[in-house]
C-alpha cells in the first residue's frame, strides 16, 4: 500500500467478544495506523482489553445495533483524518493479515473493496449450510436489483476511501440504518453511484462447534439486510 492511502484505520464493531478484539489489535499489520474498536454496549471486559492492546475504544452506553457501531467507527476514522478505512468482524472471523490485500485496490484507484470468500483464492471454514444458502440467495437478488456482478454481498470485510463517506448522496446518519441495514445500504450506494468497486478473495472462518457463531437472528436480521436494497431500488428511501 502506497502512502497515498495513508493513514489507514481499521474498525472493529464488538459486543461481548471477550479477548478476541484485543488479539485482533495485536495482529494488525504495520500498515494500519489506528484501530477503532466500537463497543456496542458490551458487559464484559473485552473493550478494556482492546484499549490496553492499543486500540481507540468508542463506547456506546447501550446496545444500539451493528450499523450504529460501524457508523461510529467510520465517522471516527473520518474525523481522525484517515484516508482509508477497513471494516472487519470483531469476533475473529476475519484475518488481520489480509488487510494489505483488501486495501491494495484503493491504491489502484478503486473507491470501495468488497471481500469475498467465494472468489477463486478465497476460502471459508465451518460455514453452516443454511447460512451458505441464504448468502447465495441474497447475493443473487442483489445482482438482479443492482446489475453488479457480486459474489459475496454479506461479507463484512470491506475497505473504503474515507472521502466516499462525505458524499451527500450517501446518508449514513439515518436512524433506520442502526441495525444490519447500514452495511447493505452503503454497499448498494457504492455500486449504483459512479464509484469504482472491486471484489477480492478473502478467508472467513467460523468457530468450530460453536452455536453463537453470529449475532444475527434468523429471519428478523436477514430482513434488516434485505430491506435497504429493496427500499433504495424502489426509491422508498434514499
Map each language-model feature to its residues.
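Short beta-strand/loop segment that forms part of the nucleotide-sugar
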Residues: 12, 24-25, 33-42, 58
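Acidic helix N-cap motif at the loop->helix transition within catalytic regions
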Residues: 19-23, 44-53
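N-proximal low-complexity "stem/linker" segments adjacent to membrane-targeting elements
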Residues: 1-27
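Short beta-strand-to-loop acidic/aromatic patch adjacent to the donor-nucleotide binding site
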Residues: 82-93
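Acceptor/aglycone-binding surface of glycosyltransferases and processive sugar-polymer synthases
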Residues: 61-79, 96-180, 206-216, 220-226
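Terminal low-complexity segments of carbohydrate-biosynthetic enzymes
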Residues: 1-9, 108, 224-238
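A conserved acidic beta->alpha catalytic loop
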Residues: 39-47, 92
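Catalytic donor-sugar/metal-binding loop of nucleotide-sugar-dependent glycosyltransferases
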Residues: 174-176, 187-205
Amino acid at each position: 500500500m502506497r502512502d497515498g492511502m495513508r493513514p489507514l484505520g481499521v474498525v472493529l464493531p464488538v459486543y461481548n467478544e471477550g479477548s478476541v478484539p484485543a488479539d485482533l489489535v495485536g495482529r494488525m499489520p504495520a500498515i494500519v495506523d489506528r484501530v477503532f474498536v466500537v463497543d456496542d454496549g458490551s458487559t464484559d471486559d473485552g473493550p478494556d482489553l482492546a484499549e490496553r492492546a492499543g486500540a481507540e475504544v468508542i463506547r456506546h452506553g447501550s446496545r444500539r445495533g451493528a450499523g450504529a457501531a460501524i457508523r461510529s467507527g467510520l465517522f471516527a476514522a473520518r474525523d481522525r483524518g484517515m484516508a482509508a478505512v477497513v471494516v472487519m468482524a470483531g469476533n475473529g472471523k476475519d484475518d488481520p493479515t489480509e488487510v494489505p490485500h483488501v486495501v491494495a485496490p484503493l491504491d489502484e484507484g478503486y473507491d470501495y473493496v468488497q471481500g469475498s470468500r467465494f472468489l477463486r483464492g478465497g476460502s471459508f471454514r465451518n460455514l453452516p449450510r443454511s447460512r451458505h444458502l441464504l448468502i447465495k440467495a441474497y447475493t443473487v437478488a442483489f445482482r438482479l436489483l443492482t446489475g453488479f456482478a457480486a459474489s459475496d454481498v454479506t461479507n463484512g470485510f470491506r475497505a473504503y476511501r474515507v472521502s466516499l463517506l462525505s458524499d451527500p448522496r450517501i446518508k449514513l446518519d439515518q436512524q433506520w440504518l442502526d441495525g444490519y441495514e447500514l452495511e447493505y445500504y452503503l454497499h448498494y450506494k457504492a455500486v449504483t453511484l459512479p464509484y469504482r468497486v472491486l471484489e477480492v478473495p478473502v478467508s472467513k472462518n467460523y468457530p468450530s462447534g460453536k452455536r453463537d457463531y453470529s449475532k444475527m437472528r434468523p429471519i428478523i436480521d436477514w430482513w434488516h439486510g434485505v430491506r435497504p436494497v429493496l427500499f433504495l431500488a424502489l426509491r422508498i428511501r434514499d
